[in-house]
Amino acid sequence: MVQNIFWSGFTNRDRTTAIADIEMIINQSGFIIDFKPFSDISISLVIEVQESHIDQLYDALAGYLHMEDFDRLHSVSSQERTIYLNVTFANAMGKLRNEIPAVPG
């Protein structure tokens, strides 16, 4: 059975800018299939990527984020793998609110 991959990183960059940059980095190697923001503190991403591109994706993200260490796979497999990435924004205040409009009726 193929194991999922769990990564975590953090950044001091502006949250909005960082999310856009991280999305561009991921889109070069794989696809974001789900995401969950946690106020302005962090965001969790579910990424699908070919196993042969995982090391490249990690290197690109590690060039942008402070990432935990990862043992390289050195794989040439085209099998799809799932990566769970949690990004913490170091300058967050925890006060982000998402306004939900009232629906009449």
Predicted regions span which residues?
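Long, contiguous binding/interaction regions
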Residues: 2-105
